[in-house]
Regions:
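Disordered, low-complexity segments in secreted/periplasmic proteins that are enriched in proline
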Residues: 23-93, 316, 377
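Intrinsically disordered, low-complexity terminal regions
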Residues: 81, 85, 271-272, 282-287, ...
Length: 520
């Protein structure tokens, strides 16, 4: 009897263990199915359906494609995820709606109108569209704008994405979201001359390239009034723009006069932003300004840790390839009505200024800022998002402080009769735990620095003159207080290394407009 009871108890225990195991360990599900609320691993670049926005990743990276792309400066819309589809997962359109689709040489003139949702008035896929003495109107209250307009030209008045558009002596007006004036994409080429372009709504640039498109402009009058609607605009996939003469005005918030994710050369043009920074560049791209008048009026926004006039940065949105952004300005004027002047963060960058007349606001925060950032839109991770910058002034007056931090690298060349008036300040407010960055200042024999406050830098090489505003010599010392050069001024320049000789080998050189000008 005892033996029988023992067998029964053993059987009961085995059944109980089996049930417990079944409750704690559910059976494996087929690949891709959800298991008791625990999602399977997703391929890189995909987002599980129904999931919210996870925390941002450090160093500007997206969390395996699961985060939302950071926004662009001063109100620009978010761009694409790196290497993938545009924000919203929209791909290249397989077809476009248009009033006129051009597949062979065609001429247009007179009044031309488009009122459809997200449609182009003229879409050139092959051949040449010759548009002369035309009055073009594009209006639609239903158009959506957004990424497909910014990246591919959906809804633009004139789109060339396979053929050539030649526009002259015409007027283009759009009042539709995403209603760019003229857009060149891919193999498309646009020539636009002696034409007035006005756009009213968001993501409606004046002249626009993306995806490798090419656009040449001469003597245009362009005005944009929406947000994220630069008068001269480029976006994902880069491209080439050459602009000669004209007036370009952007009136919207987040609408610089020039938005650069392409190779852009501009000559003898008025470039005005009334509610935004003057110029914004992202990633491995280039802008050259020759004898232009550039102005900006950026607003102070809570999401930004400072206010600027020209920015070179990397948002990690995927709108531009990561690499060195190149800003070059020869002659002309630069005016800032609010904030600092030049700002670079979370990227490599090069600035070259050659004899530009600069006007800054009375309370300008800086001439040049090369630091990390704590921007709320996620341009890298604070403490790991500094800049690597080379700045060259040629025959250039530069008034204002130079700010740098230890997670950045700055080589600043003051050359050929240039004059810096300001202090060099080590600002660690966005540097986290700091790093091994540096600031090196090079002053050639024809140049000078007027020091307006105590200054700190890693390396100072000077063959020129350093004084304060009263003409007094300035003390140069090591961090431990060891005096290298005894001065009479109240100010001290603190350095790790000091040299009375300058190596200007890596200073920037200016380009010539003639190398980029196109006659048409």
């Amino acid at each position: 009897m005892k033996k029988l009871l023992s067998l029964i108890l053993t059987a009961i225990m085995l059944v109980s263990c089996t049930l417990c195991y079944a409750e704690e360990t559910p059976p494996a599900k087929p690949d891709g199915e959800m298991v008791q609320g625990t999602p399977p691993e997703m391929p890189i670049g995909e987002m599980p359906e129904g999931m919210g926005t996870p925390p941002e990743k450090p160093d500007g990276e997206m969390g395996n494609g699961m985060g939302m792309p950071p926004e662009k400066p001063d109100g620009e819309m978010p761009g694409n995820m790196p290497g993938g589809m545009p924000g919203g997962m929209q791909g290249v359109p397989t077809e476009y709606d248009s009033v006129y689709t051009v597949t062979e040489d065609t001429e247009f003139s007179g009044e031309l109108e488009s009122t459809g949702k997200d449609e182009n008035l003229i879409h050139v896929t092959s051949g040449t569209a010759q548009i002369s003495d035309a009055v073009i109107t594009r209006e639609s209250a239903d158009s959506t704008g957004g990424d497909t307009s910014s990246f591919y030209g959906v809804g633009a008045a004139v789109l060339a994405n396979g053929g050539t558009a030649v526009i002259e002596n015409s007027t283009i007006s759009t009042d539709a979201a995403g209603g760019a004036g003229v857009f060149a994409y891919g193999d498309g080429i646009a020539y636009v001359s002696d034409t007035t372009i006005t756009t009213e709504q968001n993501t409606a640039g004046g002249i626009h390239v993306a995806g490798g498109g090419t656009l040449y402009a001469k003597n245009l009058n362009v005005t944009t009034n929406g947000e994220s609607a630069a008068a001269i605009r480029s976006d994902r996939g880069s491209g080439t723009m050459v602009v000669d003469g004209g007036v370009y005005t952007s009136n919207g918030v987040g609408s610089p006069a020039v938005y650069v994710t392409a190779d852009i050369s501009i000559h003898d043009a008025d470039l005005n932003a009334t509610g935004s920074e003057a110029l914004c560049m992202e990633g491995l791209n280039t802008v050259r300004l020759f004898d232009c008048d550039l102005s900006g009026a950026m607003q102070d926004l809570d999401q930004n840790d400072n206010t600027w006039t020209v920015i070179v940065y990397q948002s990690m949105s995927g709108d531009s390839e990561i690499g060195k952004g190149h800003f070059e300005m020869t002659g002309g004027t630069l005016e800032s009505t609010n904030g600092g002047l030049f700002y670079t963060t979370n990227t490599e960058s090069e600035f070259i200024l050659n004899n530009v007349s600069i006007t800054v606001c009375e309370d300008s925060e800086y001439f040049l800022r090369v630091t990390g950032n704590a921007n709320q839109r996620g341009w890298g991770s604070t403490g790991n998002n500094g800049a690597d910058c080379t700045f060259t002034g040629i025959a250039q007056l530069m008034e204002g402080d130079v700010q740098w931090d230890s997670i950045s690298a700055l080589d600043m060349y003051i050359a050929d009769g240039s004059h810096l008036v300001g202090a060099v300040i080590n600002d660690e407010s966005c540097a986290g735990n700091g790093g091994d960055g540096y600031c090196s200042l090079y002053i050639d024999e024809d140049s000078s620095w007027t020091v307006t406050g105590d200054s700190w830098m890693t390396n100072l090489s000077c063959e020129g003159i350093i004084t304060d505003v009263d003409g007094k010599s300035v003390t140069i010392a090591n961090a431990d207080g060891t005096v290298i050069v005894q001065g009479e001024s109240e100010y001290t320049i603190t350095v790790d290394n000091y040299s009375e000789t300058c190596d200007m080998t890596n200073a920037g050189n200016v380009s010539a407009w003639e190398n980029y000008a196109v006659e048409f």
